[in-house]
Amino acid sequence: NGRCCHPACARKYNC
């Protein structure tokens, strides 16, 4: 699944 967990995305997607 296309999960984005690097810092820039972690803010939005809270990984």
UniProtKB/Swiss-Prot annotation:
Transmembrane segments: none annotated. Keywords: Acetylcholine receptor inhibiting toxin, Amidation, Disulfide bond, Ion channel impairing toxin, Neurotoxin, Postsynaptic neurotoxin, Secreted, Toxin. The keyword Transmembrane does not apply. Disulfide bonds join C4-C9, C5-C15. GO terms for molecular function: acetylcholine receptor inhibitor activity; ion channel regulator activity; toxin activity. Coiled coil: none annotated. Signal peptide: none annotated. It comes from the Eukaryota. The modification Cysteine amide is found at C15. The keyword Secreted applies. GO terms for cellular component: extracellular region; host cell postsynaptic membrane. Expressed by the venom duct. Its main location: secreted. The cysteine framework is I (CC-C-C). Alpha3/5 pattern. Alpha-conotoxins act on postsynaptic membranes, they bind to the nicotinic acetylcholine receptors (nAChR) and thus inhibit them. Belongs to the conotoxin A superfamily. This is Alpha-conotoxin-like MIB. It comes from Conus magus (Magical cone).
